[in-house]
Amino acid sequence: MRALIDMYQRIGLVPLIIVGLVLGILIGWLMPSVGVALGLLGSLFVGALKAVAPILVFILVMAAISQHQGESQVHVRPVLIMYIFGTFLAALTAVVASFAFPTELLGLNTIEAVADQAPPSGLKEVLTTLLMNLVDNPVNAIANANYMGILAWALIIGLALRKASATTRTMVSDLSEAISNVVRFVIAFAPIGILGLVANTIAETGFSALMSYGRLLTILVGCMLFIALVVNPIIVAFNIRRNPYPLVFTCLRESGITAFFTRSSAANIPVNMNLAKKLGLHEDTYSVTLPLGATINMAGAAITINVLTLAAAHTLGVPVDFGSALLLSVVATVAACGASGVAGGSLLLIPLACSLFNIPNDIAMQVVAIGFIIGVVQDSAETALNSSTDVLFTAAADPIMKNKTA
């Protein structure tokens, strides 16, 4: 048994994830019943990540703030600027792509609308939800994975603990290290979890449902790849003043792949924390920016909102001028930042964006239904972009990366 564990550790996580991915595709395709059964492994893995993430963020942020010294370097502001700027550029990219490759949504009037969740009535509701999350009960925040509330309480308690005795602060630091060890243990099961997730997805959905929306998916994924491989590297290069691609590919490989299959930025927080520690980044910074990024850094969501909204407008023959498209980009940026506070995420913010072009709500909800049909790919790619960008921008703002030789 020990020899098997040693071999597992020696091979490395990324090669094992690739093996799990290939096996999952084959099992889901060739043996659907087995694939569905293996879905339990994926559910357990995602459940473990989601369970450990809130307490990890709370303890890690509290420990980092309580141990923070006046001369320590914290770089939260530049990361926040990159988050918002990157999300806006993603929204603009989606607009340009939608104008360059106009897409019609097939069967828009024949698809049953999604009615089990109510979309927000406007930006005010989105922002109100976001702000109310800040003042949530701390126990409730941890129990429901409300990361805005968790961050707020962790910061407040961390600041209060600065005046605590050295012994108390050491205990908090030791607790933080213990939670980090638990996270490393959970992440070690990523290949098995991804095998289960992929096998179950292929077994239940197959490939046929995606084929009819091939053009729409191509534009969505193409925009996300453009942001990940062109726009983000430019932003990073401007900050670290050297070739950004080694860092970009590291983040995509070690964060993006896991996020693609878990389809949860919150579940991927422990993975990002682990990567940030491996890169040698300042804990005072990444313990705050990574959970914050999982809440407000939503470039993928902005792309999804704009592409589907403009596709609906094109299908219905609604004219969209440059000013309206620019306004849509601003609205999508603000709405995307609040996507984590909306049940259903980016898809249920589409009616909000559609309202800018007077598209009826029943039609907008049919667009949401199309989003759920392609969600296997759309949501996976969106989460991979969002989560890998969290750790990428955090690293780009850290002087450690600037000081490393290319």
Curated annotation (Swiss-Prot):
Is Membrane among the key words of this record? yes
Q: What is its main location?
A: membrane
User: Where found in the cell?
Assistant: Cell inner membrane
Give the molecular function GO annotations: neutral L-amino acid:sodium symporter activity
Q: What reactions does this protein catalyze?
A: L-serine(in) + Na(+)(in) = L-serine(out) + Na(+)(out); L-threonine(in) + Na(+)(in) = L-threonine(out) + Na(+)(out)
* Keyword terms: Amino-acid transport, Cell inner membrane, Cell membrane, Membrane, Symport, Transmembrane, Transmembrane helix, Transport
Q: Can you tell which superkingdom this protein's organism belongs to?
A: Bacteria
SUPFAM superfamilies associated with the record: Proton glutamate symport protein
Q: Which GO terms describe its biological process?
A: serine transport; threonine transport
Q: Which residues cross the membrane?
A: 11-31, 45-65, 79-99, 141-161, 185-205, 216-236, 298-318, 330-350, 357-377
**Protein's membrane topology:** Multi-pass membrane protein
* CC per GO annotation: plasma membrane
Q: Name one Pfam family in it.
A: SDF
**Family note:** Belongs to the dicarboxylate/amino acid:cation symporter (DAACS) (TC 2.A.23) family.
Q: Tell me the function of this protein.
A: Involved in the import of serine and threonine into the cell, with the concomitant import of sodium (symport system).
- Name of the featured protein: Serine/threonine transporter SstT
What is the native source organism of this protein? Psychrobacter sp. (strain PRwf-1)
The organism that produces this protein has a lineage beginning with: Bacteria, Pseudomonadati, Pseudomonadota, Gammaproteobacteria, Moraxellales
